[in-house]
């Protein structure tokens, strides 16, 4: 019995530690500029670090967020990402940025960021935004209509979306609490996986006719 209790305590402690570490680790140096060259590099947060003495201002700089992204696509939106791949100096700093452009009635379809909370500010247009809470919270929808200057937060891991409900283009900027937040677009992931998920599984899960699922998989096929 004593061994059993000890095992339970060890297991619980391991779980607590794992959850506590489930974010970008804090840096143990002033900065760690990501570099592709393995020579004299130190591997941190999935990137090799440049020798700090060789770091320069360009490692912490990006230009171009003043330019609108192309929204000529099926969802009528475009996300311009500025993360560690664009700014190597973001490595280990736990933050990134995106610009989102929406054509009239365009949307950033339901998706989730597995590694980051997102805070979005609308600078132009009118958006309807929201996120859905987890199963244990009965999948509640939290949604608002945003006007320029309004801010909305999407908690880490929650499925969320933005829709331009105006007749003019909309522009938003968002900060994310990870150097590389990751993105999982729900429709693309479920109906466009490689290889595809068995249509019978999705038909039962979504309570759809299997032929409807097959049609959706054909539309989202990579």
From Swiss-Prot:
<dbReference type="InterPro" id="IPR001929">
    <property type="entry name" value="Germin"/>
</dbReference>
<keyword id="KW-0964">Secreted</keyword>
<feature type="binding site">
    <location>
        <position position="160"/>
    </location>
    <ligand>
        <name>Mn(2+)</name>
    </ligand>
</feature>
<keyword id="KW-0052">Apoplast</keyword>
<feature type="signal peptide">
    <location>
        <begin position="1"/>
        <end position="22"/>
    </location>
</feature>
<feature type="binding site">
    <location>
        <position position="111"/>
    </location>
    <ligand>
        <name>Mn(2+)</name>
    </ligand>
</feature>
<feature type="glycosylation site" description="N-linked (GlcNAc...) asparagine">
    <location>
        <position position="78"/>
    </location>
</feature>
<feature type="binding site">
    <location>
        <position position="118"/>
    </location>
    <ligand>
        <name>Mn(2+)</name>
    </ligand>
</feature>
<feature type="disulfide bond">
    <location>
        <begin position="32"/>
        <end position="49"/>
    </location>
</feature>
<feature type="binding site">
    <location>
        <position position="113"/>
    </location>
    <ligand>
        <name>Mn(2+)</name>
    </ligand>
</feature>
<keyword id="KW-0325">Glycoprotein</keyword>
<comment type="similarity">
    <text>Belongs to the germin family.</text>
</comment>
<dbReference type="InterPro" id="IPR019780">
    <property type="entry name" value="Germin_Mn-BS"/>
</dbReference>
<dbReference type="InterPro" id="IPR006045">
    <property type="entry name" value="Cupin_1"/>
</dbReference>
<keyword id="KW-1015">Disulfide bond</keyword>
<dbReference type="GO" id="GO:0048046">
    <property type="term" value="C:apoplast"/>
</dbReference>
<dbReference type="InterPro" id="IPR011051">
    <property type="entry name" value="RmlC_Cupin_sf"/>
</dbReference>
<dbReference type="Pfam" id="PF00190">
    <property type="entry name" value="Cupin_1"/>
</dbReference>
<comment type="subunit">
    <text>Oligomer (believed to be a pentamer but probably hexamer).</text>
</comment>
<dbReference type="InterPro" id="IPR014710">
    <property type="entry name" value="RmlC-like_jellyroll"/>
</dbReference>
<feature type="domain" description="Cupin type-1">
    <location>
        <begin position="63"/>
        <end position="214"/>
    </location>
</feature>
<protein>
    <recommendedName>
        <fullName>Germin-like protein subfamily 1 member 14</fullName>
    </recommendedName>
</protein>
<comment type="function">
    <text>May play a role in plant defense. Probably has no oxalate oxidase activity even if the active site is conserved.</text>
</comment>
<keyword id="KW-0479">Metal-binding</keyword>
<dbReference type="GO" id="GO:0030145">
    <property type="term" value="F:manganese ion binding"/>
</dbReference>
<keyword id="KW-0732">Signal</keyword>
<keyword id="KW-0464">Manganese</keyword>
């Amino acid at each position: 019995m004593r061994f059993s209790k000890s095992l339970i305590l060890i297991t619980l402690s391991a779980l607590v530690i794992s959850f506590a570490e489930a974010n970008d680790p804090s840096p143990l140096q002033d900065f760690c500029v990501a570099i592709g060259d393995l020579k004299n590099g130190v591997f941190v947060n999935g990137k090799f670090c440049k020798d700090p003495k060789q770091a320069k201002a360009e490692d912490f700089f990006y230009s171009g967020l003043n330019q609108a992204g192309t929204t000529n696509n099926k969802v009528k939106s475009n996300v311009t990402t500025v993360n560690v791949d664009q700014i190597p100096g973001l490595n280990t700093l736990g933050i990134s940025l995106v610009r989102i452009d929406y054509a009239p009635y365009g949307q950033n379809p339901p998706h989730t960021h597995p590694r980051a909370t997102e805070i979005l500010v609308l600078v132009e247009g009118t958006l309807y935004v929201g996120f859905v809470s987890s199963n244990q919270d009965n999948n509640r929808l939290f949604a608002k209509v945003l006007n320029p200057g309004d801010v909305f937060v999407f908690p880490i891991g929650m499925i969320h979306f933005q829709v331009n409900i105006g007749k003019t283009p909309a522009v938003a900027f968002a900060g994310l609490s990870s150097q590389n937040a990751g993105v999982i677009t729900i429709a693309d992931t479920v109906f466009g996986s490689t290889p595809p998920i068995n249509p019978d599984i999705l038909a039962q899960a979504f309570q759809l006719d299997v032929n409807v699922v097959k049609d959706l998989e054909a539309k989202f096929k990579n």
